[in-house]
Structure formats: C-alpha cells, structure tokens
Amino acid sequence: MSWDVFIQDLPPDARSVKDIPDEFHPRSLGRRDDVVGRIRTVFPDADFSDPTWGRLQKEGYSVDISVGDGEDVNGVTLHVRGSDEAVGAVISLIDAIGGRGVDSWTGELFDQAIALHSIRRWRAYLEEI
C-alpha cells in the first residue's frame, strides 16, 4: 500500500476537487521524455530504466512514479511510502512536473499545509491493518 498523489493539469482556480467541472478534460503535462527530464532536474538519481515507471529511493522513503505508456503524459501518479521526509519530495515533484496534485488520502487537492497530517494518517492506518 502507498499514499498516492495524482498530478494533472487541473484548473488553477479550483479550491477543491468539487470545483472541477464534470466536463473538464486536463491538458497533457507534456511528452514523456520532457516530464521525466523535469523530474530528473530535482531528482537526478530517479531510476527510469522502465520509461513508464520511475523509482525514487531515498533513505527513509521511496516514491514510485507512474507516467503511463503514452508519448503524451495526461497524468502522473506518485506512490509514496515511508517517512515524513517524503512530503518534501512530493512537493518538489509536483513543482517540477507542473499541474496540481490530488491527495488520495483526503480526496482533495494536495495542500502542503496538511500533507504531513495526511501521510501520518496513512501510516497510522497501515499500523492498524
């Protein structure tokens, strides 16, 4: 299991997932090579030996990065595991990739102010199951 964050080109004026119109279709985040290149600007050691699936392994946390198998990337999913330090990596990845994130734990737009609380709730849930 992982704490997942979905990144897409979401409307900049949306304050909540509820603010995204049903008919909204996100634009591409770019060509896969360009998206991977932007990721590598902040994490040059990200392993993209599989061009559709990257892996960032750091002491205390890891992030699997799904960019899909199409040439155009419509969304990126971050599968996050580990310590609180992972939140900083998620913030850096969202900034580098572009677009906005949706926090799978809250079901809302990624919010730096509550991201630590979100990953901690996810870890607490793991301890319960």
Q: Residue ranges of each PLM-predicted region?
A:
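Acidic (Asp/Glu-rich) sequence patches and key acidic residues
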Residues: M1-I129
